[in-house]
Amino acid sequence: FEGMLKRVWKDVLDHDLPTPFPRMPYHEAMDRFGVDKPDTRFALELVDFTETFKTSSFKVFAATAISENGAVKALNAKGLADITQGELASLEEIAKSLGARGLAYIKIEKGEWKSPIVKFFSEAERAELQQRLGIGEGDIIFFAAAPWERGCAILGRIRLEAAQLLVKRGKLTIPADQWNFLWVVDFPLMSYDEERGGYAATHHPFTSPAPEDAALLDSDPKAVRGQHYDVVLNGMELGGGSIRIHQPELQKKVFEDVLKIPADVVESRFGYMLRAFRYGAPPHGGIAFGLDRMVALLCGTTSIRDVIAFPKTQKAQDLMAASPTPVTPKQLRDLHIQTVVPEE
């Protein structure tokens, strides 16, 4: 697969892609970049300060830091202290849309740390922030205090927005002709669904667990890594796939013991597959690849509408084919469709 991409980039752009592509575990991608499809062409990485703030006088951070799965993370948007109130309000709305109560920040202007929260920080806490974030004049530090995954996602989105603001100001360059391919691997096999009160498959229920983690299915399903992989380029997922379960006993365990699907439902929906596996299905897997996304990137556009054969408008109209068009009564009869016009 990497060989195919290498050939395409060479033939189309005369660019030599280095292979093999780097591999980044899901946890690292979220922890450093706040997203499972990181754009690694620029830094602005997230830094974890959970341990730092466990005994802090700032109760919001301290309470999160000592809570189960809580995390306090920070991001230094270097040179963005000149952010406008409108831009700051927009970032805060984005953070709130992802579950944050607000967006804490510190501006560094004229050598002074400007923020209502600074008064709660000890000298040791300030020193660690300074050292690990490389804080300098004109910087702005954004914080997220939340359950780990949510906190990462909040700052991950702020990271992308801040990068665009820095690009607009000429303070950051993101090369359009830099192709940072990587594989994101080791996704969690299961995630806990709070509403349903049980586990759900992160990818799909046929993904095979990592062999060394399979024993944890009984005791700690959320700690099991799945053999799921995504190929990512410059912050865009080009494709994803997995190695599938091929052992009937393991597949049945995932259905019934982990996902809690009733045995009769498993039999009615998947019985044919479990029986087929008993005849010796080999280990197998694959990948679903977004050809249109790849072509869009090669053409220098971010919208697949520019490269697909029959793009649709926002109203789902195909302007080239002038569709959709009215259907005839005969077509409706052939398909046994009856339309009912509401009474006015």
Residues covered by each model-derived region:
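Class II aminoacyl-tRNA synthetase catalytic cores and aaRS-like
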Residues: 1-344
